[in-house]
């Protein structure tokens, strides 16, 4: 199953969703975020992962208002 990486956050007072691509597996999708963090010298204090009933995985990475969503795109 492929997964779309989405970043949910705020720019000013406006909620935004930025899509960062579709990957073949959940692991590849999550690694794409880790690689971006490494490239940009960012290290989260923690990653809290939650799985939703629809198969979406989301990461809380300590920013309080920004999250990564890994959305399943079908078989």
Where do the PLM segments sit?
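Intrinsically disordered, low-complexity regions enriched in Ser/Pro/Gly/Gln/His and often acidic
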Residues: 1, 29-30, 48-52
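Short aromatic-glycine-(Arg/Gly/Cys) micro-motifs in beta-strand/loop hairpins
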Residues: 1-17, 47, 60-61
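A short, charged, amphipathic alpha-helix used as a generic interaction element across diverse proteins
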Residues: 13, 24-45
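Short, mixed-charge low-complexity intrinsically disordered segments
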Residues: 36-75
């Amino acid at each position: 199953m492929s997964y779309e990486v989405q970043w949910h956050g705020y720019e000013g007072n406006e909620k935004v969703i930025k899509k960062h691509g579709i990957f073949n597996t959940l692991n590849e999708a999550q690694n794409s975020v880790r690689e971006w963090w490494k490239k940009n010298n960012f290290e989260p204090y923690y990653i809290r992962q939650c799985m939703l009933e629809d198969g979406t995985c989301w990461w809380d990475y300590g920013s309080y208002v920004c999250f990564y969503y890994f959305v399943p795109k079908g078989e």
